[in-house]
Amino acid sequence: MKGESDFIDALRNRVNRDRGTGRQGETEITPSARLPVTVSASLIAGIGDDAAVFRSTAGKETVITADLLVEDIDFRRTTTPPYLLGHKALAVSLSDIAAMGARPLWSMISIGVPEDVWQTEFVERLYDGVLDLANRYGVQLIGGDTSRTNDNIVIDSIVTGEATAGMSVLRTGASAGDQIFVTGSLGAGAAGLRLIERGAHLAEQNLGDEDSQKLDHILLRQLRPEPRVGWGIVLGEERLATSMIDLSDGLSSDLNHLCTASGVGALIDSALLPIDERVTELCGRRALDPLQLALHGGEDFELLFTVKPADVPRLPRRVDGVGIKCIGTIQSTSEGVKISEGPRTWELKPGGWKHF
């Protein structure tokens, strides 16, 4: 790669040009069709200026989130293709915006890399992953920064979104009697990490075709998480969710975060947890516990949300092909946060990811 200015010029030109279908390659992990980047009339200045400038929208409130990915803490260069790393860097921030019931609009990606990495195609492939995901959700890359590091790669992702004024979904709105729902399935993000730690790679050749597909599905839930942007928008704009959080740290930890913020307790039923069936099958072979992965593993990036009983019939069954499952009920704070398994009930303590 040439210098930073050349890279910025190339990135700006790519973001601004009118694009249709994409490049060849990465067929098993790249969407087959690429949508054009949405260029909003609200954007006054983007990539190439000292800062981005955009007009505020009347009747809207701005939602902003930031996420930091650090090599050897959040990912390993040896097991994460740069395209997928770019995808995940943006996906984790889109998941936060979805958890607020907001619509994502703008993104800024900053990256620090060692000089030997800068001299390869790594950074371009990383931004390919960012831009492909951004295109899918009409998000425009409007800036960021690049810098040199001594050893490890560091990626900072900032995403800005909008919600109708007064309609952002917070963690603080749950009340006793609300039903607790999750999108999608649980456990695959953590199972994928366990497989990577044990040396698994995409499309392992020593397995049969069906087993390889199952393994790749689990690995990609870790390497290429899918943010539930559509569900977030529906739950926010239709005023369906009373509270919401994304499942990045693990169900046990994130449910406790939500209950603490709302000043409530909760009871969930382990039999109702939508554990990915491929995870259950894998755990039987690899001496892993699917319930523990679903409760404490984290990195599923599903949405956990609460709904008043009267609003449950209004919930769509699926959004963007993803369903939901009721897993329990919000209770009074005196009841604590608990989980049941048959006749047995116990306290569900936070057991997920801890940053420090």
Language model segments and positions:
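A short, charged helix-loop
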Residues: 204-226
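Glycine-/charge-enriched secondary-structure boundary and capping motifs
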Residues: 1-13, 17-18, 60, 80, ...
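Glycine-rich anion-binding loops of enzyme active sites
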Residues: 69, 103-199, 329
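Internal active-site segments that recognize and position negatively charged phosphoryl groups
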Residues: 181-184, 224-251
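Residue-level signal for inorganic ion chemistry
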Residues: 53, 93, 101, 141, ...
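Extreme N-terminal cap/leader segments of soluble proteins
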Residues: 1-20, 26-29, 39-81, 100, ...
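Alpha-helical scaffold segments that flank or form the walls of functional sites
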Residues: 84-100
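Compositionally biased, low-complexity intrinsically disordered regions
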Residues: 24, 32-34, 106
